[in-house]
Structures are given as structure tokens and as C-alpha cells.
Amino acid sequence: MNAPVTYSASCEQVIPELVNEACERIAPIWPLDRWIAVNPWWGSRTGPVEKVSRELDNLFGAGLLMPPAFYREAWDGGRIQRPHLEEAAREAGLKDDSQALLAQLSGAASNQPGFVSALGYTRRGQQEPPLEEVREEIGRACARYFDLRQNRWRVSGTKQDLYQFWLSQSGRSLARKASVEMLLKPDWQEAAATVARELPYSSRQLPLVIHHLLGHLLGWASWCRGVDWRAALGDPHESGTEHFCAQLATIWLIHEAHALINMTEAERESWQNRYVNAFDLAPASANEQALWIWHRAYELAWQSRFLDDIRSSERSSLAEPDPVAEVQAAFCIDVRSEVIRRQLEKVYPEIRTLGVAGFFGMPIVHHRHGPTDDEARLPGLLAPVYRYSETLGSPSEDRELDRKLDSREQVRESVRRAKYSSLSTFTLVETTGLAWAWKLVRDSLNRNSAKAEAVEPGRLHHCVDGYPLSDPERVNLAEGLLRAMSLTKGFASVLLLVGHGAHTDNNPNEAGLACGACGGKNGGVNARVAAELLNDRQVRAGLAERGIVMPESTIALAAEHCTITDRITIYGRDQVPDSHQRVFNTLVEKLEAAGQACRRERATSLGLNGKTDDDLLAELKRRTRNWAEVRPEWGLANNAGMVIGPRSLTRSLDLGGRCFLHDYDPSQDPSGEVLTLLMSAPMVVANWINLQYFGSVARPDIFGAGNKLLHSVVGGNLGVVEGNGVDLKIGLPLQSVFDGEHWRHEPMRLAVVVDAPAERIEAVIRGNADVRALVENRWLWLHRVEGDQTLRYDDGRWVTT
């Protein structure tokens, strides 16, 4: 083999580090039942977005931009207008020449990678390279290894990591070849070091090669990265696991070395001369620069209107306190909440709505009665701290209920074992088939009514040692929530905490419609935990000592907003005192009216125009339980902006359900502590959501989940494959962003507006590496409000927009 690379330090130490460096470029994914939106380019955030796009184009033939025809259509249709193109060219430091830019749109867009691995190289006499065969072998090995639920015939043995499992299964065929046998070491670190010495890649090139190879099974690479990510956060589901992505990379490297070994000397020389130095990126071509100008003009077409609206909004001065509202309702920052908040304020002027991250600052796992696993209900960026365990009020009652549920589950498990057993699979159908007939008919006729998730009372404990929370800890949680949404005074008689969720049937992607801040779960549980804390007398006494006085006349209630039907379910209605019944009854009436207005507003996008209010609600209810419904709602499609500031900035605006809204009062945060939290957590989560939708539209073949109609679930809840494919699909199904004729999401980077002094925002950028990377490398656009002006952060300075 030509030109093996010599590494200066011990390979056993350096190579695994390089392998892990490559794995850091892969974004993680979560299981279907805990699915959350992820920025597919998160691992590349430290590079400028334009350069990363060029690198990905070189590695995969998959840059970030839409094809030229997309921008041409936007120009011809008037969505992009000349002022937008002029501004985009000016930002790029180029002279506006619309005719030249139009001509460059006609240039052919290359989707061919510049680098081709030895596995992807077609040798003389071959019809195709060995890549596809290897891809299928590794993909099926991953499916067998990670399939812990559906594959009930798997023979249990000694615990193996992924590399060892592959070695004992698929690796045996390679082991028969003497030239490769020396590479097959018993552990992945040693194997990676051995293989890397045999490859002609430098220490700079090796991580790029690994990234390229992992991209051929991006779904499984992302899954392995997710397992590593969750294990690092202490997830009990992933305990005892580590470096799965690195193990997968090592398997790929072994196959790459094998492909090189099989080449003739002439073939190796030809391949190396052509591809090994293909990692040196050429400067951006004129066509590429033009395409970025067109994309920026496409963004400016919406952002300019958005910023104009912010500047001209009818807002009161922060120096003028809002009159005390009759009700305060805190919603998740999710873009779908913008619609219900706007409609609720329209029908109920006495209400004040607020926006806050939908897990309500409760970093919890939820433990239900019976033999169930804990459910994480917090953002994927965080590790759970507390467990919320349901209780009937006494340990004896809890144990009795657990025993009953355990018995039921044992019966169900017996049926499942018979159903999946290799001996009884067919006889079970013959003997019990008729017993399932009524359920089949009932479900086919949509007779099951979808209901909001039941939320039972519970107690908070520490995840690690199981001890109850101390009073100061409970006060900390409550204070953190109230300060996060700048609600520290002027409390209304009713404080409603509204989580949100979606209720669908036969939908593996259901978690993608639920609350991302709650780990792909519905938000009612978190709302209930927060409301219980805020109603606790000892917690209120502790808050008062810290300067937050909640009057005795204020009650906190929890609720959940179904984003498909726009109905809001309030929990604990029977606990509302007589003194609050008038306000409560008014609230219930106004919530129903606001939901009705929301349904009318959404009818056009759902193709349900012309229906009466009753028929519209009935149709949306049907969607929650229809087996065949592929578009129960549009989720967060078309998200484009975020506002971190007082509601007065946006209360007079119709933002079309396109903006994340988080309340923030800069006058209550002189230290900038709250702003740091909001820009480093909710803003990053919004970026993850925004760029997942972006990727699912820009490159649905790579960063999307394909056609829902062809999905097959892998491993019970690992993910989905499309048709007979071998790779997990990441991102969003086509039906979530495309209506059959038009894209329902416009691929734009998030435009964030923050109402805070420049020095406070800049301090957050300096102090947080992730925020700095996203802002300075243009993965999002950051603006601030100053009087009646908006200014954009641009290379360390603020530019008037």
C-alpha cells in the first residue's frame, strides 16, 4: 500500500482521538418515543456556514442551499424583489447586478462530491464499487445490534459492544482473508490505530475521511452519536455505553483498508493522485457566491417585513407598568403558541399571555404507576435532576396499584411472547383471531376518542439518591421559572401554565409534534409540577424572602394545549375555590372561543376551508385518531423568527405562527444572568428546530425522513427506515414539510430579536462558546431593539437594518 502515514505520538492514543473528533461532527438523534428536533449541522457550528456548506458539498455532494431553480421561482413570483437582492449583495461586499446574478442562477449546480473513498472507487472490471454492499452489511449489523424490542428471537449472550458484535457476526468473512485478519483487533481502539497506520490519510485528513464514510449511513451514525450523547448526560437507558459512534467509524475504516488492499498498484496510484488531496477546498466560485446572495435575499424578503413590524409595533414603555391582568397565561415558546396567544388576547383583553420554555424549568423524569420506564421531560441539551413520581397519597395505595398494573402487564407480555414466538406466531392467529375483530373494526371506524394525557398528582425526588427535595431546592425551581419569564410582581388572581402536546394514532413521528422542550413528550406533566410548586405555601414563603411575593389570592393552574384541535384542557378544575369561579368560568369560555378562532385561521393550510365551526372541530378530532392520517397538523413548519423581550413588542402583531416568543424584561435582569440562560438554552433549542426543518427541505434525501407511507419502524422505537432501506432516516418526513404541490416550510436561518442593551448581549456572546459559534458563523441572525430601531450583529458590530 502506498505512502502509509506515520503519526508522531502513540497511535493507540492519537487515532482514537481523531476518530472521536470526526464523530463530534455528527449530530445526535433520539428514539422515536423521545424524539426531538436536532440541528443536523450542530457538529459543524464552529465553522462559517458558507465554508461548512462547501466542505459538505465536497464530502457528500450535499451543501446547505436550495437548487438555483428554487430562487429563480421566488424571483419570478415576486417573493424576492430587487431591494432584497441589493441588500444581500451589499452585505456580501459585492455590487448589485441583478442581470448577472440571474445569469449565474442558470449555472449548473454540482451535487457530486469532490472526494471519493477507496470503498466508493470503481475499479477496472467492476460495474459498481463495493460501497453499497458494505453499506448494507453494516446497516443490517447495526439494526440487529440495537434492536432490543421488536427482535424477540434474538439469542442472548455475553454483553458485547457494537464493534465486538460486528466482529463476531459480519467480521468473520473478512477474518478469512490473511491480508485483513491483522487489522481485526479485539477492541476498537487498537483496531482503529492499526487500520489508520495502513491508510494514506494524514491526521488532518483522517477525521474528514471518517465523516465522509459515516455519511453513507448517516442515520446509524447519528443514532450512535445520540447514544453517546445521552450516556454522557447520565441517561439510565444508556448506562454503561460509550463511544458507539467511534466503534462504527472503526468498522468503516476496516472496510476502507480492505478496499485499498484489493486494489492493484496502478489503481491505488490512480485513486490517490485523484482523490487523497481532494480535501483542499478551492475558494468559493462565482456561482456559489451568487447562490448565497440569492439565499440571503430570500431570507431578507421575510426578515425585512418582520423587523419593520417590530419597529412599528404599538408598544408601551417598560417604565409604564402594565395594569394587573385578570388572568396570566404562560405558554411554551413554540411557534404554534403564537397563534393561540394572539387569538386569546383578542377575545379576552383582560388576559396577559407570556412565553417560556415549555418544560417550565422543571428538569424532571416522570415515573408513572406500574412497570414503566422513567420518561425524560426536559430539553435534550440537559440532564434530568429530579424524578416526579405519581402517587395516590400513601405508600400502601401506591403499592396496591403497582401490583395490579404489574399483573396486567404480565398478561400482556404473555400474549406478546406468544404472538412473536417462532412456534406460536401462526397458531395464535388461528385460535384468537376473532377475539381481536371488534377492536379492529372499532379502530378502523375511528371510534376511539383521543384524550389529553392524564396527569396524576405526584412527588418530587432526586434522581440519584431518591431523597425528597428540600424547601430551598423547591424554592429555587419556582424562582427560576418566574424569573425566566420576568414574572416577579403584579400577579393575577389566576396564573395558568399551559403545556402543549399532540394526540395522534398510528404515528411513529408523534413525538415530533409534541413539546421539544419536554423531550418529545406532551407538556401537561411539567405544567402540573410547576403549578404544584407555585401553590405550595412553604415555597411562596421562600419566594417572598427572595423578593417575589405571590398574593394568597393568586392560584396556579396547569393545562395542556392540543395543537391539532386547539382545545385546552385544564387540570384540577375541581380545586378552583369559589372565590375564583367567576374568573375561571370566563377563562374557560374565552379559551374555547380562542381555540375556535385558531381552527379557522389554520383551516386554509390544512385544506379544510368552508366547514362550519362544529364540522371543523369534528374533522380535527378525527385526525387525532385516524390510522391513515399523514398530516394531522403542520407542526413547527415555517418557523422563521424568535423574539426575546416583553410581550409589548409583539402584542399588536400578527406573526402568522412563525415566531418563538420568550418573555424577557431587561429592567429586571441588570446582571444579565437571565439573558445568558435564554440565549444559551431556548435560543439554541430554537436553532435546532429551525435548522432541522431547513435541512429537511434543502436536502430531504439526506437530512429528511423520506416518505411516511414507506416507513417501517426499527427496534420498537429506535427510528424508521424507508422501504427496504438499511439506514435510519433522520429529520422530518416529507409530509411534514410538503403538501404534494408546495413546500410548507421556507428554508431560512432563524432571525432572533433581543430586547436588551448591546453590552449585555455581547457579554453572552463572549461567555458562551456555542452561542458565539452560532452568531458569528451566521447559523442564525441576531438583532437587538434600540428605541424605534433594530440593529443586526455583524462581525462584532451592530448594523442598522
Curated annotation (Swiss-Prot):
Cofactors named for this entry: Zn(2+)
User: What is the top-level taxon of the source organism?
Assistant: Bacteria
User: Could you tell me what this protein is called?
Assistant: Probable inorganic carbon transporter subunit DabA
| Alphabetic keyword roster | Cell inner membrane, Cell membrane, Membrane, Metal-binding, Transport, Zinc
> According to Swiss-Prot or TrEMBL, what is its membrane topology?
Peripheral membrane protein
Q: Which gene encodes it?
A: dabA
A GO molecular-function descriptor: zinc ion binding
- Which residues hold Zn(2+)? 332, 334, 500, 515
Q: Source species, please?
A: Marinobacter nauticus (strain ATCC 700491 / DSM 11845 / VT8) (Marinobacter aquaeolei)
